[in-house]
Amino acid sequence: MKFEKDDKKKKVSEDKGTIVEYFYMIPAEVTVRDLVEAVHCVDEEAKEIWTELDLMEIVLSADSLIFENMMDTFTEPGDQEFLAAKGVKVVYAASYNTKDKDMVKKVLEELYAAFGGFMASDTEDLEPIFEIADF
């Protein structure tokens, strides 16, 4: 008995990663210029800022790591209570592709060393909160 080989090639799905978003909560008044100057683990050409948008982009291998000031969106009384209780002065949305997580961790280590703070979930109650070891 002869078995015929299936000539159709099976498609191998490539993991493209997932875009995730957190809030980087910082206990100091920090601008995107401050953020970009604190990051040394990537080439200067990979970093770009838009001061008028208060936005920083770092081009990584799968996608970009983007920090955008979101302080003006935390206007609800519950938000204000959370920020005050945690001593947060500025909030940046941080979005990145999960395929870049190792480099994102290096960037976050540099930012945490320079400014402190923590990452909060993009959820209604901002929980859970993540420390650098969680990345």
Residues covered by each model-derived region:
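Short, intrinsically disordered low-complexity segments
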Residues: 12, 26-99
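Acidic, proline/glycine-rich low-complexity IDRs
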Residues: 1-22, 30-49, 95, 102-135
